[in-house]
A protein has these predicted regions:
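Radical SAM enzyme core and accessory elements
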Residues: 1-47, 121-122
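Residue-level preference for short coil/turn positions at secondary-structure junctions
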Residues: 40-41, 121-122, 151, 203, ...
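Residues that mark the start of a beta-strand
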Residues: 42-44, 82, 258-261
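Short polar catalytic/cofactor-binding loops
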Residues: 49-55
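Glycine- and acidic-residue-enriched helix-capping/strand-helix junction motifs
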Residues: 56-69
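Glycine-rich beta-alpha loop elements in corrinoid/cobalamin-binding modules
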Residues: 75-76, 82-227
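Radical SAM [4Fe-4S] cluster-binding motif and immediate context
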Residues: 229-230, 234-271
């Protein structure tokens, strides 16, 4: 594993700098109808929240249910796709913390081998949430192991780290086939539909990839969804909320409380 000093983060030149102000006016009901899964298709879309990486001096960091993946899972299921979520941080009790091989970091949740064992053999698309840049070295290693064991799986990365540095992670980890930047519901739905039906995904908003000529292709950040009230409810049944409650991890400030996250708005209100 390479040391942190070898990582060089390059800023992304976003084609449209006004993306935060631009809204996606499409209706989710219409997209759910247009991009439905093929009937009786047994292929699976697996979404994954990987383990948390933190300093060895920190016993734990606050962990919460993966709200973003729950919403994404809700959209995909509503469109008829067989969807599973691997929650490496809270999917199995007890929530364990192990030390990294270099003895510098704590890894909170299921390790790479345990995650590999949970991947359905019928998985066609594997979506992984990459949120924080300091976790990249470990999550890159996980992705490489997934591709080695399941070479035919299409791996797509989302989350803040992926959105901020798509070219970097695609070139640093060729095991990643695509990146979805920005809000993923509309993009992931159309992306899945096209792949399931053998169609091109090269022009879908929010998609980034390395083409056959080894050139980076970036379709920009997906627009902000105008009406989040029209999104399907989070697919909490694909997760195990009780594990968080039983381990005393919750959303509220009061220990031992039973609180669930909700979506009231997206993005920073101060831009």
């Amino acid at each position: 594993m390479r040391s942190e000093e070898e990582i060089i983060f390059k800023p992304v030149k976003t084609p449209n700098q006004n993306w935060v102000k631009e809204l996606d006016h499409r209706h989710m009901d219409s997209s759910l109808s247009s991009f439905r899964a093929p009937k009786n298709d047994k292929r699976v879309i697996t979404l994954c929240k990987p383990f948390v990486v933190c300093s060895k001096k920190s016993y734990s960091i606050p962990i919460t249910l993966p709200l973003g993946l729950a919403y994404l899972g809700g959209v995909l299921e509503k469109a008829g796709y067989k969807t599973k979520i691997i929650d490496a941080t809270g999917g199995k009790r007890p929530l364990k913390i192990t030390r990294s091989q270099d003895n510098l970091y704590n890894l909170q949740g299921l390790n790479s081998d345990q995650i590999l064992d949970l991947i359905d053999s019928n998985t066609f698309i594997f979506g992984i949430s990459l949120m924080f840049s300091q976790e990249w070295l470990f999550h890159r290693s996980l992705i490489e192991k997934i591709k080695k064991k399941y070479p035919k799986i299409i791996i797509v990365a989302g989350g803040e780290h992926s959105s901020a540095m798509p070219e970097y992670i695609l070139k640093d980890c060729p095991s990643i086939d695509y990146v979805i930047r920005g809000e993923g519901e509309f993009s992931m739905l159309e992306f899945s539909y096209n792949l399931f039906n053998g169609k091109s995904v090269s022009n879908i908003p929010g998609i980034s990839f390395i083409d056959r000529e080894n050139k980076f292709v970036d379709n920009g950040l997906s627009k902000r969804i105008e009406n989040i009230d029209k999104l399907p409810r989070p697919a909490w049944h694909l997760l195990k909320p009780e594990n968080y409650f039983n381990e005393d991890f919750s959303i509220g400030l009061m220990g031992g409380s039973r609180n669930m996250p909700i979506l009231g708005t997206r993005g920073c209100p101060f831009q």
